[in-house]
């Protein structure tokens, strides 16, 4: 029972999603090969990054305890129900953070460790705090969310180059419509706790247009790995097809569906699209 509650505190769904994007960066660097040569490194970087993301989620839960208790979708989180105390969560998060640093420092490379630490700082120190203050918090959070594929890539090549930037942009532009779709779906919860989310402050109509704008940027960014010569023709075709398909379905829903159906459409296909792109990268 306690294991389940501690696992819930680390938000395994977020960890899993980020590890998929990390895999995309790793595959781009190895040209879709994870044989015996790269398998140990792949396992180590996955573990190290997973621990850091888990630590970030734990500290996010600690800071958000007060607003989580007022929102329907978060009111059963362990800190809200009292199954785990703030002190226990702080110790847990600190242990995860230390373990992550040890794994990445000793078993991966220092560059990847620093990149992941930056992502942690942005998520916990900037995004978590700023989402109570500004409508731009989602964009700031997009920075931390775009870090895992860069970490996966640098773990192999040990350098920050244009390919790393391309991976960052793909995930950054993907995250904005994905996150705003969630904001639209749970807008009533966010209104309860007075969070200045874009759909609340600027309205649904404006938010939908912004989502399509970032979606268009995402489609363009998907061509970058091939343009830079790091991705092959197969990867380029798959990436562009699924990105354009997401764009098409979103525009179609924008024109014909209700706001909620539009948000569900964007969210549903965002998961499918990023998974396919990351697993065929290389």
UniProtKB/Swiss-Prot annotation:
Name the chemical reaction catalysed here. heme b + (2E,6E)-farnesyl diphosphate + H2O = Fe(II)-heme o + diphosphate
A GO term from the CC aspect: plasma membrane
Q: What this chain does, per the record?
A: Converts heme B (protoheme IX) to heme O by substitution of the vinyl group on carbon 2 of heme B porphyrin ring with a hydroxyethyl farnesyl side group.
Biological process terms from the Gene Ontology for this record are: heme O biosynthetic process
Q: Which GO terms describe its molecular function?
A: protoheme IX farnesyltransferase activity
Q: What is its main location?
A: membrane
Spell out the Gene3D superfamilies in the cross-references: UbiA prenyltransferase
The record's similarity note reads: Belongs to the UbiA prenyltransferase family. Protoheme IX farnesyltransferase subfamily.
Could you tell me which species this protein originates from? Francisella tularensis subsp. tularensis (strain SCHU S4 / Schu 4)
Q: Which UniProt keywords apply?
A: Cell inner membrane, Cell membrane, Heme biosynthesis, Membrane, Transferase, Transmembrane, Transmembrane helix
Give start-end ranges for the coiled-coil region(s).
none
Pathway involvement? Porphyrin-containing compound metabolism; heme O biosynthesis; heme O from protoheme: step 1/1
Residue intervals passing through the bilayer: 9-29, 39-59, 79-99, 102-122, 139-159, 165-185, 210-230, 231-251, 261-281
Protein location = Cell inner membrane
Q: Which domain of life is it from?
A: Bacteria
Q: What else is known?
A: Carbon 2 of the heme B porphyrin ring is defined according to the Fischer nomenclature.
Which Enzyme Commission numbers does its entry carry?
2.5.1.141
**Membrane topology classification:** Multi-pass membrane protein
Protein name per the record: Protoheme IX farnesyltransferase
UniProt xrefs under InterPro entries: Protohaem_IX_farnesylTrfase (IPR006369), UbiA_prenyltransferase (IPR000537), UbiA_prenylTrfase_CS (IPR030470), UbiA_sf (IPR044878)
């Amino acid at each position: 029972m306690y294991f389940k509650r501690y696992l819930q505190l680390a938000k395994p769904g977020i960890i899993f999603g980020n590890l998929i994007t990390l895999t995309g960066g790793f595959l781009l660097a190895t040209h879709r090969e994870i044989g015996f040569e790269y398998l140990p490194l792949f396992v180590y970087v996955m573990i190290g990054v997973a621990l850091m993301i888990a630590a970030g989620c734990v500290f996010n839960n600690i800071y958000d305890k007060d607003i989580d208790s007022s929102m329907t979708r978060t009111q059963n989180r362990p800190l809200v129900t009292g199954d785990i105390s703030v002190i226990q969560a702080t110790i847990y998060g600190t242990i995860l953070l230390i373990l992550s640093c040890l794994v990445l420092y000793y078993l991966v490379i220092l560059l990847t460790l620093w990149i992941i630490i930056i992502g942690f700082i942005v998520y916990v120190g900037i995004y978590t705090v700023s989402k109570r203050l500004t409508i731009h918090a989602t964009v700031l959070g997009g920075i931390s969310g775009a870090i895992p594929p860069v970490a996966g890539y640098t773990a192999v090549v040990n350098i920050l180059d244009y390919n790393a930037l391309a991976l960052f942009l793909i995930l950054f532009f993907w995250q904005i419509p994905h996150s705003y779709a969630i904001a639209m779906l749970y807008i009533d919860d966010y209104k309860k706790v007075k969070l200045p989310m874009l759909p609340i402050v600027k309205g649904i109509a404006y938010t939908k247009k912004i989502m399509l704008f970032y979606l268009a940027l995402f489609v363009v960014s998907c061509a970058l790995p091939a343009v830079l010569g790091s991705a092959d023709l197969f990867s380029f075709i798959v990436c562009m097809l699924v990105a354009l398909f997401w764009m098409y379905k979103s525009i179609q829903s924008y024109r014909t569906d209700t706001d909620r159906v539009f948000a569900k459409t964007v969210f549903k296909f965002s998961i499918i699209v990023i998974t396919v792109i990351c697993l065929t990268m290389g």
